[in-house]
């Protein structure tokens, strides 16, 4: 297909040029950018385009909308269009113009559109005399103005939420912006079905369906071993400034990477070079001196629009509600997308992030009996010399080639390097009755991690037995190199919890080494690779069967030298581990699809040895899901309800009646088996006109089925995961005389949760609570807007994380506000 660019600025010139071509020619309409135009999914604007040939109407619309569209003139020969009158977004406008022509405008990775035959699908809606295809939104969410998406990419290829037989939530760009979600921790706190738990190292642990999410991260679909270490917990210092969306899958995600946690996975999808010029400036200021500035700019870098760029710079400086802690973030991101041919696009990107912080970590202790000290929420028991420095560099690259209308191949790679230097101390030790002091435990960390990831897959559709099917076949590999030195030592000073001394003298680094209770250098290399395939068979018009499998090879070696004496060499290998996936979808009508699915995942445990000296089998996680999904209002609203059951078995457990040559002197056995089950309900998108909503309710019940300690059988596990969790946020754009205003409101609510102390066996409980948040936005004109966000509006006092008597109890944020000013050019 040849590509010709119409003369830039005048629609009449494009019209004359197009009408002059022969029917066999292929064309790209490259329109100029009208004032106020934005990215791939522009905001709604008014059009008055009279009836005429479809080529004429399509050309005029592309020009006025400021988008580029490629097509063969033969596709439009002899077709007419009634025109377009009214206010529409780009996708909606294309859909209405094309009507029942049998064609659709498909958004490409490059940000341009391509005209292709509309697939035969049962989920089309009849609106008057116009047939509109069910998918108006695309996978890209920025500038869509929506809390839902037209497609997800976490499972390879692009499929609607309704076509995906697993639970997936997408945190769109609008949601990120509306709630000022700037870190992965903040994103996960707002995601339905996810529970966030603070670690003593300042990171977060994420839980889904009763289990911890560990190491299941993707960058643009490329799997990495990010966030799976003590120094980071499950989170890491990545800023959300340069991401388009975050896709969160709940349930076993073995097809993503092979090994990992039972509970789910996360895919971060970055912003790309833009097809039309756009710049956004953002400044915000809030409670506790929380200031942030951001510049996001992009557009075509040549006249043809075949080279597109993007640059994002963000800087944030903030204090916290607890004493003296502060943090500064700097983010730099650049991206380039190049159309090597009309069907081949190369994407490149690089990000650099720097964190300079004086944190307050470790949380608060309790009385020895587990009761609350009732300290002020502003209390920090750490010394003022706590430091945390982190630098992260990430390089992205991908190449996508469209072989024809049905088949495409994509190759993508990611490299990331993270260095962290940490020195801190925190309160560690329960407070005795009649006393007010606790110990201080200090730590020194020098941490380096380099990750590589590569993924390549072929995705295509084919016809057989009178139906249309899809095949995905791919390979991927990842490697993680961790070089860590740490030392933990008890400080000689005590801390008074009711009158803390923040100016405790800072010990020299050598003190931590000379007085180390644990620590030393640790080097770990983890490699895994695999092949995977998914086949979507259309057995009948309403019935689709999905079957997939992955074969994985895994290797990990870790070498530790202990400052207290001795070494440890841990090895774990899995060869040809098969991970299956099956699913079935039944379209009940034009809106609803019922589905059932099974997936599993494995976690290697070969570094544990049994009494016979053999390596333990992998821990296995199995997920069963039965549900129904809905797609409404041309895909602008998605609903889902499911029943789930997850079983985790063969967990390594300590045999305290044995003796082995391990670091703790004990042997292990595959003995643990636990189960989590419950149901989820979720709604995302435009519920009524101008109201965007993301809401999810999750009920989770956990049970220990088999434990080496028989007294635990029948009880719950991970009891700090609440049984009931509600996440809700809505944003409503007012109409009439108040059309410049928008209002948002939401709540994070959960039932009680508890921990049984490993020290005293006391039950430490946090009662259920609800935290209400709100937002008011005002659009000054087409360029400027302002917003005021308020969090914890009723100033609820609660612990967001409960720990033990010794440490790990974290207060939730008190009431706070953030004002934001934005300009878009």
Locate the predicted segments by residue:
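Outer-membrane beta-barrel translocator/receptor signature
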Residues: 226, 242-244, 255-334, 340-344, ...
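C-terminal beta-signal and adjacent terminal beta-strands/loops
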Residues: 748-758, 777-825
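Gram-negative outer-membrane beta-barrel transporters
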Residues: 541-542, 669-757, 794, 824
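Acidic, small-polar-rich N-terminal luminal/periplasmic segments of exported/outer-membrane proteins
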Residues: 64, 68-70, 77, 83-85, ...
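Structural signature of Gram-negative outer-membrane beta-barrels, strongest in the C-terminal barrel
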Residues: 337-341, 449, 468-472, 476-480, ...
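Membrane-embedded beta-barrel scaffold of Gram-negative outer-membrane proteins
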Residues: 398-424, 618-686, 693-698, 702-706
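Acidic/polar loop-and-plug regions of large Gram-negative outer-membrane beta-barrel proteins
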Residues: 316-320, 333-402, 415-449, 493-524, ...
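Face-selective signature of the C-terminal outer-membrane beta-barrel domain
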Residues: 395-418, 441-559
């Amino acid at each position: 297909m040849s590509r010709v660019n119409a003369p830039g600025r005048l629609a009449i010139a494009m019209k004359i040029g197009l009408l002059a071509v022969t029917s066999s020619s292929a064309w790209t309409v490259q329109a100029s950018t009208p004032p106020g135009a934005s990215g791939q999914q522009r905001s709604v604007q008014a059009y008055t385009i009279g009836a005429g040939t479809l080529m004429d109407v399509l050309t005029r619309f592309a020009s006025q909308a400021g988008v580029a569209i490629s097509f063969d003139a033969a596709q439009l020969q002899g077709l007419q269009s009634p025109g377009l009158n009214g206010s529409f977004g780009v996708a909606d406008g294309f859909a209405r113009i094309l009507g029942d022509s049998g064609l659709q405008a498909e958004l490409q990775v490059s940000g341009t559109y391509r005209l292709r035959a509309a697939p035969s699908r049962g989920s089309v809606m009849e609106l008057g005399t116009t047939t509109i295809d069910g998918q108006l939104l695309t996978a890209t969410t920025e500038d869509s103005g929506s809390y839902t998406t037209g497609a997800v990419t976490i499972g390879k290829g692009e499929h609607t939420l309704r076509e995906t037989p697993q639970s997936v939530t997408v945190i769109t760009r609008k949601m990120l912006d509306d709630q000022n979600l700037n870190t992965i921790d903040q994103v996960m706190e707002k995601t339905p079905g996810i529970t966030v738990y603070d670690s003593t190292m300042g990171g977060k642990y994420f839980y889904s369906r009763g289990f911890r999410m560990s190491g299941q991260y993707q960058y643009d679909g490329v799997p990495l071993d990010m966030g799976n270490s003590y120094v980071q917990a499950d989170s890491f210092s990545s800023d959300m400034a340069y991401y388009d969306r975050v896709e969160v899958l709940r349930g076993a995600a073995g097809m993503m990477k092979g090994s990992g946690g039972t509970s789910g996975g996360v895919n971060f999808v970055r912003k790309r070079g833009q097809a039309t010029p756009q710049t956004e400036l953002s400044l915000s200021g809030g409670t506790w001196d929380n200031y942030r500035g951001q510049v996001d700019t992009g557009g075509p870098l040549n006249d043809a629009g075949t080279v597109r760029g993007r640059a994002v710079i963000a800087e944030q400086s903030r204090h916290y509600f607890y004493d003296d802690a502060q943090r500064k973030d700097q983010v730099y991101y650049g991206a380039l997308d190049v159309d090597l041919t009309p069907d081949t696009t190369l994407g490149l990107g690089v990000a650099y992030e720097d964190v300079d912080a004086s944190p307050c970590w470790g949380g608060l202790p309790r009385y020895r009996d587990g009761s609350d000290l009732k300290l002020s929420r502003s209390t920090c028991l750490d010394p003022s010399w706590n430091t945390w420095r982190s630098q992260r560099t990430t390089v992205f690259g991908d190449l996508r080639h469209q072989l024809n209308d049905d088949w495409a191949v994509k190759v993508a790679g990611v490299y990331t390097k993270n260095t962290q230097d940490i020195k801190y101390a925190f309160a560690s030790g329960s407070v005795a009755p009649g006393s007010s002091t606790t110990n201080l435990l200090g730590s020194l960390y020098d941490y380096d991690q380099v990750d590589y990831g590569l993924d390549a897959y072929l995705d295509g559709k084919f016809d057989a037995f009178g139906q249309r099917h899809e095949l995905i076949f791919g390979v991927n590999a990842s490697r993680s190199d961790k070089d860590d030195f740490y030392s933990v030592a008890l400080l000689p000073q005590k801390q008074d919890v009711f009158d803390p001394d923040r100016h405790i003298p800072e010990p020299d680094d050598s003190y931590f080494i000379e007085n180390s209770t644990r620590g030393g250098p640790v080097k770990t290399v983890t490699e895994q690779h695999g092949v995977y395939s998914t086949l979507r068979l259309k057995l009948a018009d309403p019935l689709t069967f999905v079957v997939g499998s992955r074969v994985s090879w895994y290797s990990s070696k870790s070498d530790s030298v202990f400052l207290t004496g001795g070494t440890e060499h841990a090895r774990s290998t899995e060869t040809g581990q098969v991970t299956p996936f099956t699913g079935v979808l039944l379209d009940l009508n034009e809106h609803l699809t019922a589905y059932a699915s099974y997936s599993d995942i494995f976690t290697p445990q070969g570094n544990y040895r049994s009494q016979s000296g053999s390596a333990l089998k992998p821990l296995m996680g199995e997920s069963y899901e039965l549900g129904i999904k809905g797609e409404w209002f041309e895909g602008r609203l998605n609903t889902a309800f499911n029943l789930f059951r997850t079983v985790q078995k063969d967990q390594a457990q300590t045999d305290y009646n044995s003796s082995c040559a391990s670091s703790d002197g004990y042997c292990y056995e595959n003995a643990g088996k636990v189960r989590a089950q419950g149901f989820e309900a979720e709604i995302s998108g435009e519920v009524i006109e101008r109201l965007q909503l993301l809401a999810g309710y999750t009920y989770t019940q956990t049970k220990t089925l088999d434990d080496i300690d028989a007294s635990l059988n029948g009880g719950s596990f991970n009891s700090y995961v609440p049984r009931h969790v509600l996440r809700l946020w809505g944003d409503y754009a007012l109409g009439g005389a108040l059309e410049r205003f928008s209002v948002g409101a939401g709540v994070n609510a959960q039932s009680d949760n508890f921990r049984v102390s490993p020290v005293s066996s006391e039950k430490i409980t946090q009662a259920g609570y609800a935290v209400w948040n709100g937002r008011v936005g005002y659009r000054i004109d087409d360029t400027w807007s302002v917003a005021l966000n308020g969090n914890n509006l009723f100033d609820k006092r609660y612990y967001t994380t409960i720990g033990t008597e010794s440490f790990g109890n974290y207060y939730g944020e008190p009431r706070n506000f953030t004002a934001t000013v934005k300009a878009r050019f």
